[in-house]
């Protein structure tokens, strides 16, 4: 692919003339230089880990234990807290030292990776095939490529099992469903039934079903990681030991750019899935740390005013609202008792502060009259005023609310950022897949620049 651009910036002889790529095409110059490409990837990993460590320490330095995490714009500490570090009952932070340790470990790791990146970019061998055949490769070598795929799958499987080990043996993880408002606990009886675990994959993605995003107990999450880790490890071993079948050799494009496009597609799916997970799921992403989900904040508002008006003498079971439906309580299409008013659309919501008040047919009127605990009132009032709404200029909350606080939920940030990144990765997948297929078909030159329409247009002035 020729690129018409200024080729003056040359580094170590890899200029536009020798490689066919200009400086801004970045790693494209390194496609066939496995040693230099290794340097670029290790350096990139160093930058990622450096950001993680530095941002982690930045959040620790700014953290105020008296305020909830989601009010402080934190996106890393909630992940550490969810893993059970530094928190106690109700998600209260009792020790920030583990967070400090995490930041320092990432910074030290990033220094090692940074050194490796600089070494392999500037000093190490340009190609690895001659001196280190195990680490060397040729993009067309299908057997070597699936071996590398297998190694990556095994590493991902080990990662999944690290979470399992943390939950089972190393202090447990934070369970938002623990009685009394959440606590750290060890997961003892994992869900390993394939019908349950793979049942999530077969669910519809729409309301009431919610695909894998609907998972709402830690036993299923950790059990799912056992399955996923096992599949990744056995799949990895299989890919290392076998060569691609004939149908795969024919169907797939076997070039560096093709592998890039496959990876971008996978990351895009991860991004979209993570977006839905952090937006809707309050088990994997506990509301104590990330703030309530949208449906949760809405239901919390209905609950808060039900509590208030019931204290003022309203009969919440029979009060009629302005539309003729129940003001506080009504029935869902399938007959459950649900909160009335605008929040009826979120009747699916399950949340730890609300479930104790449900009976076999939805919300239980006698429990609503006699059993509401102070912690449920406090938590719903807190969630009501912290809906995951907000804008880029950090003016948060409901747009029409006159008593709004300046707050943007980390759920908003994490969901939006992962959606946007997932979208761009998908566009990158289309771009690189198109180029890789064109190159494989033999017409990767692109448009003939001599026939560019703009060359035949009269000047604007």
Curated annotation (Swiss-Prot):
It comes from the Eukaryota. It holds the Pfam family PSII. GO terms for cellular component: chloroplast thylakoid membrane; photosystem II. The modification N-acetylthreonine is found at residue 3. The chain crosses the membrane at residues 57-81, 122-143, 166-188, 243-263, 279-300, 435-459. Keywords: Acetylation, Chlorophyll, Chloroplast, Chromophore, Manganese, Membrane, Metal-binding, Phosphoprotein, Photosynthesis, Photosystem II, Plastid, Thylakoid, Transmembrane, Transmembrane helix. The modification Phosphothreonine is found at residue 3. Residues 1-2 form a propeptide. It is found in: Plastid, Chloroplast thylakoid membrane. The keyword Transmembrane helix applies. [CaMn4O5] cluster binds at residue 355. HAMAP family: PSII_PsbC_CP43. One of the components of the core complex of photosystem II (PSII). It binds chlorophyll and helps catalyze the primary light-induced photochemical processes of PSII. PSII is a light-driven water:plastoquinone oxidoreductase, using light energy to abstract electrons from H(2)O, generating O(2) and a proton gradient subsequently used for ATP formation. This is Photosystem II CP43 reaction center protein. It comes from Nandina domestica (Heavenly bamboo). The gene is psbC.
